[in-house]
Amino acid sequence: MRYESDPNKYDYPYSGYLYLEYQKQKKLTNSSNYSFGGQIGITGDASLARGMQNLYHDLVLNLPHLKWESQMPQELQLNFSASYFKGFNIKDNISITSELYSRLGTYQIMSGLEVGLFIGDLPWLGFSDNFIINGDSKLSFFIGTKQEFFLHDFKLEGSLFNEKADLVMESNNYRNLFLFGFKKNFKDLQILASYNSMSKDTNNQRTKRHPFLKISLTYNLK
């Protein structure tokens, strides 16, 4: 169905989101912190998603371009975010981590809880964070889950304020994700890699779960 031109047969709307994000994190104790921030971005053609995906098809996959029929409309998006992280040390280099997080705005309205087990020498700041705390060459492993509840998701449902979207789908309110991976620090360079298995965003999706690999590189500019 990759090259299907009839949007009525799609299992997920085409959608792109290009944004700038600001996030400020405040340490409360050696095992807890909170953060807050926001995003301002654009959806639709201005997100450049269509061009980037088809460029990937040209340069990497050597496949024809995707149709991108009835993609989500071009609109300005504004979102705010907040989170609270708490870790619980079990014994040396073994910790349980937890994080409550929420997003509120035109693109998404949701809340989630991330819980997992962190094993290793690197500071435990959550699975998605790749901040460099120190320059020591260390390694950590993690396994965990994210349990999320969505009230609104633009990439499936379109705007809260108008009916411009050509194709919308019912969003699953409850979603979950399971992941495992590692963080490795090489002094000024840190790598985060994880394998993820995500539940359906909408019941229209043909596969029960969506697996994907996430790789993040962080470099400390001195």
Q: Can you name each region flagged by the protein language model?
A:
Residues 2, 122-222:
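Outer membrane beta-barrel transmembrane domains
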Residues 1-132, 152-170, 197, 222:
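Outer-membrane pore/translocation modules
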